[in-house]
Structures are given as structure tokens and as C-alpha cells.
Amino acid sequence: MNIESKIKELTEKLNQYAYEYYTLDEPSVEDSEYDRLYQELVKLEAENPQLTRADSPTHRTGGVILDGFVKFRHPYNLYSLGDVFSREELAVWEERVRKEIANPEYICELKIDGLSLSLYYENGLLMTAATRGDGTTGENITENVKRIKDVPLKLKEAIDIVVRGEAYLPRKNFAKLNKERELEGATPFANPRNAAAGTLRQLDTKIVAKRGLATFLYQEASPATNDTQEEVLEYFEELGFQVNPERKFARNMDEIWEFIEEATRLRDELPYDIDGVVVKVNNLAEQEELGFTVKAPRWAIAYKFPAEQAETEILSVDWTVGRTGVVTPTANMTPVLLAQTTVARATLHNVDYIEEKDIRIGDHVLIYKAGDIIPKVGKVLLDKRPEGLEGLEIPTKCPECGSELIHFEDEVALRCVNPLCPAQIREKLIHFASRDAMNIVGLGPSVISQLFDKKLVADVADLYQLTIEDLLTLDKVKETLAQKIVSAIAQSRENSAEKLLFGLGIRHVGGKAAKLLLERFANLRALSKATEEEISEIPSLGGVIATAVVSYFETDGAKILLDELENAGVNFDYLGAVNIEGILSGKTVVLTGKLTTLKRSEAKEKLEALGANVSGSVSKKTDLVVAGEEAGSKLTKAQDLGIEIWSEQDLLDL
């Protein structure tokens, strides 16, 4: 046997042994035999590096020092899930599904508390691994993910597929890691989720390999070739992915809740952290029929476990002004440990919330973290209230500018409507420069506050006139940081226009809505001239957003600001694929079978450029099926329904 054949044999044998060990939990050889073969492969590859295969298991342990993480644009939108926190809220969602789908069936899965990632395979080989990021753009973490031993470098089938899952740190490995950090004098991680996220952002891949991350895969992001979520998970197992075995088929709310109760009992016994249960409509065609909101699928929901609570005392209340003028109360409290972090402040939301709970300074309260992130006051312990405590004094004037505060009838918030309120301007500047908006690195709250206080900037357009000399007048800003900020400001001029639109801070327009708006109108100037009717035609965007956008661009201030930004050289064009009226505009199209000329992602991009909505399953709402070679059940179903069929060549001819 020649060396190339020997390397191939060892690689395939070791990958099979790893699959048996990590996925099937049924090892067929002793560790010593695996180690012997592994060392033999290491030696052969070292002597013949040109023969090292892409799926070699040695990629999992070898060390690479990365320069950083490059951005990765996902070819598919990776939506987050909506959350519910009670049986009543879950029942509302289930009833909403039932109104659209007759006799829906569900799959209930554990919600793993880790870091979301996507794996991209071509011809069965792992080519790219990326974080979810904002759902459109994440970070390429391929080298680190290759060090996770249960992630297959080569699938059991030579297919193109994109899968989503969760990387997590098992509790045993988390305890070991924190013990090592304490011995080294480093700060322990607060929880396994933070440890997993920190590990995947390591530049030294040897550290990733050492820490022992693991994964569970749960969704096909590329158009699915199965009919149900249950079939998708079974197919994943056949391909070699690690799939969580704790799942249940359910037909109604009672059966869903039975699984949630079982998951609650299991929670402390599992070798990994979970923070809830995900409920999905099982049938993929029905998922397609239900569709998406701007942020989340309508066919799935995440039930989050009740949050951990802690008792503390309210010492004082601060009132702060946000960029939209909303005045928010925040409680200062006796510091207390909650969900493994020390908490000393909690939001009180608004005046109605304070009055409803009758919150007073000096009260003992129970606090919790909503979604395990934001501290909130849940309950006042009235039996511990000292005598004589007076109710909170509600401000009538803005704490920043002194203007009268307004309480509109249709709102619960107090609002400062002074457009020149310094707090609002400062917060708008901070928002504009933030990561999800224009991403001006180095231009954080401290620097912006100083620029504003020194009257070096008064609106976002002024940022593009800043010089290194201006920045050097600020406290703790040296030459290197000043150059970095000026460079980041210049770079932000080239951003795609949805970043700018989000950065303008128009009410109701978040990142997803901004992207949908620019996909449709292609240019910020064109959007600024759009009517409410035109905007309302965009799927997932309603009249509230349409009214907010049109009202904003009708103001003199917005018109002046656009001129200033354009004169400063800021890009107004959307740099992604534009959904203009095309031959397939508004059509729902399904791809099936093997394509011989185009990659599946290329075919999807071409269809979307023609205005199509690309779906993963065939239903009565499907307008067209593009069928490649060896097309199976989807093609048969389309023919039965009388749906128009195209070949790959038909698509290429366009």
C-alpha cells in the first residue's frame, strides 16, 4: 500500500472510530488502539504534508494562531426565536398556530444554553463554520470549530448542506476549566455559556481543543430535503452529527407541557446547561405556510425556564433619558449575587410599573434576570416594608434639560419631547456609532460624551468632520486611539445603507426592518421618498413602521441630516441583493434535487435576485419548483399539485 492510500485508510478509520465514540456512544476499539493509529497518521502527515486530507482528525488538535476573525455573510437569514415565560403565554402561541394550521403536530426539543453556530458543508466536507451574529453577518470561526471533536469534518454523504446548532461546554469541563483559571490567578467564567462563547473567540486554536466544547445540531438552514423536523434530526444522525436525544412528539398543549415539566425535572441532572424548551411545528410545509415575522419564525417558540430570584433592598432610583426621549427609572440596590453575577441595579421600566407594584425606596424586593440577562424587580415583599415609607416621587421635568415631561395616552412611558435635549442627542450619537449600526470602533459612550460636552459634535453628521487633533483634546485619548477612531469613521462611510438607516434611530425601525426596507428600495434617498402604501407592501412590515419611516423623512431635520451625510461621503446604497420587481417577484420557489452547474447557494441567490421567495418545502402556496437530477418526493408532490416545474437549465437561461 502506498503512502497516500495508507493516509486515506487511517483517516477514514479514525473518523469512523470518532463517530462511534462521540455520536453513537458505542466505541468499537480501545483508547490505546485509537491513539496508536492516530500517532501513525500524525507521523505520516508530518513527513508528507501535501497528502494531508481535509477531513483528517489531526486538524482537531493542531495549533494555529489566528490573526482575528473575519466577517461572514450568511446566504440564509438565521432568525432568533420568540420567547415565552409561562404556560399561558405558550398557550396563546399554540392557539395562534392552530388558527392557521388544522391539527398541527409539534416537536419539543431542549434549549441548549450555549452559542449558536452554522456549519457549511460542500460535497460532504466542512468548509466554513460561523457564528450567527445578527442573523445576516457573523464571524468565521472555522479553525476553532474544527477543534470540537463531535463536529464531523466529513459527512457520511457527499452533499452540500448548511446546518444550525449550539456549541456548549459540558458542566464537567466547565468545572475543570474554572479550577485551572483559579490556580492561574485568572477570573473564573460566570457560567458555561460565557465560557463557550469565550472559547470560540480564542485566537489560539490549541486552547479551543483543550477545553472540550461539544455540539448539538438542530436545524437545516439550507432548503431541507425532508418533510418534517423529526426526519431532519434523524437524517442529521445518519450524516454523523450530534443530535440531542431528549425530544418529544406532541399533538396539543397538554403534551407540550408534559415535556416541559419533564425537562424541568431533568435540568439539574443533565451534563450540560439548558435554559428552556423549544417547540416547533413538525411539518416543514406547515412551517413554510406560517412564515416569519421580521425577527422570528411564527412556527417555533422558546419557552424559557422561570428565572432565578434573589432578595435585596432598594436604596434609590435614577431617572435616565434615552435617545427617543423616554425617561426610564432604574433602581439602585444593595448588591446581591444573582445567576452567578453580582447585581446592584435593576430596571423599573416605567411609571405604570412602579405604581402597579407600589415600589418604594427602602422596600425589600425579589429581583430576577429576564432571559438570564437583564435584572428586573419582580415582587415587593410587603411583609418586610418598614412603616412610614412614602411612595416614589415621579418627576414632572426632564432630569437632563428641565423640559416638561409628557405622558401620552397611548404610551406607558414618560417622554421628553425637546429635540434639543442633550441626553437624547448624546444617546443618538452612541447608537449611531454602535456595533449593530455604523460600527465605528473606538467611538464608545465615554468618547462620545466628551465630544458632545466639548461641543465638537452636535449631530451624527458632525462625526465625519472629526480630526485626530479634535480627538487628542479628550481625556485618555492618545495618538494611537485617535488614529484608530478616525480610520473607523472613514471606513463606516462604505457601510451598506441598512446600517446607516438603523443608525438614524427611527422609531420602530430595528436592524431587520432596516434590511428589509433597503432590500426593497435599494437606496436611502429612494426610501426617503417612499409612500406609506409602498412600504406597507413589504412582507413582515406593517403600517406602524411605514408611518414612522414616512413621518421621519418628512421632517426638515431629517432632510438636512441626509444632505449633510451625503456631502460627507456616506454611502446611501444597499450593497446586498435587491428585491426589485423581477420575473419571479412575489413567487414562492422550491429547489430540489442535485444541481450540476450551480451550487445550491448560487441558485438561491439567482432566484432571490429575480424577486423569488425561496422555500424549503412544497405546499399549495408554492408557485414553482426548480428540479435538478434525482429529484424525489418534492418533485412528485409538485407534479401532483400541478405546480410549474423548471429544470436547472431553465433557470440558467434567465
UniProtKB/Swiss-Prot annotation:
Coiled coil: none annotated. SMART domains: BRCT, LIGANc. SUPFAM superfamilies: BRCT domain, DNA ligase/mRNA capping enzyme, catalytic domain, Nucleic acid-binding proteins, RuvA domain 2-like. Keywords: DNA damage, DNA repair, DNA replication, Ligase, Magnesium, Manganese, Metal-binding, NAD, Zinc. Zn(2+) binds at C398, C401, C416, C421. HAMAP family: DNA_ligase_A (MF_01588). This is DNA ligase. It comes from Lactococcus lactis subsp. lactis (strain IL1403) (Streptococcus lactis). The lineage of its organism: Bacteria, Bacillati, Bacillota, Bacilli, Lactobacillales. The gene is ligA.
